[in-house]
């Protein structure tokens, strides 16, 4: 898998590349969380869930369905989240007047951005040189997919991340992940 740092780079790159204001600042945080969240499945190792299990590492949380669920949650949060620090009400932080209504555009925008951010995670993981692949089509298929081109070195888990192998992984991610962004 690429490191968690590289997964966070995708929403940051999208936000920076978009026309100013196209992706509001309040949406950046949820996008970064959505891009990193699938790797919370490493907790499966501590729970003795086998790697190859549907709920193991790179399993269900790396599916497009999971990205879709996060997108729906983002849309609901954007629509009903007035009064929250990053509410979609008029695409403004808490400064929006109480009479402002969330727009359909801001709700759809939240869903699309969060979906792209969450879906980027398994797509990047599928481009790595190791592991069992990603369960993109879960729950319809438990098949693990790899991209036909896999230039990114698989990231070691901590504490091995802070080693020569971890540095080689970061350089690989810089070359194949960050620079193209």
Can you say where each PLM-predicted feature lies in the sequence?
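N-terminal membrane-targeting hydrophobic helices
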Residues: 1-181
């Amino acid at each position: 898998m690429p490191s968690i740092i590289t997964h966070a780079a995708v929403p940051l790159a999208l936000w920076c590349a978009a026309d100013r204001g196209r992706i509001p600042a309040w949406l950046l945080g949820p996008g970064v969380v959505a891009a990193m969240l699938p790797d919370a499945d490493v907790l499966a190792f501590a729970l003795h869930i086998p790697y190859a299990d549907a709920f193991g590492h790179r399993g269900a949380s790396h599916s497009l369905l999971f990205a879709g669920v996060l997108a729906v949650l983002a849309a609901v949060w954007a629509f009903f989240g007035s009064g929250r620090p990053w509410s979609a009400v008029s695409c403004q932080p808490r400064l929006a007047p109480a009479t402002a209504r969330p727009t359909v555009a801001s709700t759809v925008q939240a869903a699309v951005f969060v979906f792209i951010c969450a879906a980027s995670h398994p797509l990047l993981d599928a481009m790595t040189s190791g592991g069992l692949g990603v369960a993109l089509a879960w729950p319809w298929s438990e098949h693990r997919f790899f991209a036909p081109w896999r230039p990114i070195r698989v990231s070691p888990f901590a504490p091995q991340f802070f080693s020569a192998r971890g540095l080689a992984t970061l350089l690989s991610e810089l070359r194949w992940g960050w620079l193209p962004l």
